Amino acid sequence: HAETFGVKIINDHIDEVSLSSKPFLLKGNNEYLANSLIIATGASALYLGLDSEQKYLGRGVSACATCDGFFYRDKEVCVIGGGNTAAEEALYLSNICSKVHLIHRRDKLRAEQILQDRIFEKEKEGKIEIHWNSQLKEVLGDESLVSGISLDSGKEIKLEGVFIAIGHKPNTDIFTTQLDMKNGYITINSGLNGNATQTSIEGVFAS
């Protein structure tokens, strides 16, 4: 779509930037100069760091229900987390899967109340089962696919899909020493007075 407006698309991975003066310098496989820069690097899903989690990534472990949920139609799955992301993933999957186990390490959810209410309705319907004060210890399976999970309590649950929903990390590491940030997210002007997406450096914007 962008190409129809004359945008030139270059496939490269930028791993170094210099924003100290204009033109800004970007380095990847090649070097690029720009008087203005729009940062739209997105965020990456956070994982628990378990060896078994990485072993089955893409083979039963996922961090995106809308991407991979259809593979588990009428199957039993679990969602790890208790915030908005976990609640949204669990609700989405509850309309596809036979049952969703929501694994949360605390005794109450952190999600917005409207999402919690929907979760509890699905729980009454038997579509979602909440495991309070529980943490994922290990993803179980054979050499190719997930067959279940083990919790820190010792309980094992047979299922075929594990969805990790514990938050995201913004992809902003290369800007950390050059732009103002909060919790890894680039801060912008905001407001209605123009240049709402401008960062702490003039000519650098974040979306």
Model-derived segments and spans:
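A Rossmann-like FAD-binding core segment of flavoenzymes
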Residues: 2-4, 8-26, 31-32, 95-191
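Phosphate-coordination loops involved in phosphoryl transfer and adenosine-cofactor binding
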Residues: 11, 73-75, 133, 201
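N-terminal Rossmann-like NAD(P) cofactor-binding module of classical short-chain dehydrogenase/reductase
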Residues: 38-39, 163
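FAD-site-proximal beta/loop scaffold in flavoenzymes
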Residues: 44, 49, 55-71, 166-207
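Residues at the starts of beta-strands that form the adenosine-phosphate
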Residues: 76, 98-102, 203
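Glycine-rich Rossmann-fold phosphate-binding loop(s) that bind the pyrophosphate
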Residues: 81-83
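N-terminal Rossmann-fold NAD(P) dinucleotide-binding loop
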Residues: 86-87
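Generic hydrophobic/aromatic pocket-lining and core-packing "Φ" positions
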Residues: 90-91
